[in-house]
Amino acid sequence: MNASISLLCFALLLISPFCLGYSDEERESDSLRVAEILQTSKDDESKINRTQELLDIFRRLAPSLSPEDRERIERSIKEHTDEILIDGVPSQGGRKTKYVGKILSPVAQGLAIGFFEELGGSLSRLFTG
């Protein structure tokens, strides 16, 4: 009895990583969502407000990317986001855009829109190949 429970636990440990991956359905859904965000974000405010959603899509996609693609996009993200700290320690995956919900000067607004377009374009290229 004890051996069968141990064997079952071992089998679950071997199978569990395959259940945590980024499925083709999720990838297709995120691809369509990125395209929708880019097409429907016509004004500056909507671009700035939807940047966080693009960041969330990148977080889901990141483990399935090549190290080069991930690093390239993460460099850009680090320039334009603030790290979320909990008790002075960065939270796991904790970054938020610097621009959402703030009154921005024209220069900062231009940076925020440029970041939205850069991130959206990078994600779109990753999905379309």
Swiss-Prot record:
One of its GO terms (biological process) is cellular response to UV. GO terms for cellular component: extracellular space. Residues 1-21 form the signal peptide. It comes from the Eukaryota. Keywords: Immunity, Innate immunity, Secreted, Signal. It is found in: Secreted. Its main location: secreted. InterPro entries: Turandot. A humoral factor that may play a role in stress tolerance. Belongs to the Turandot family. This is Protein Turandot C. The gene is TotC.
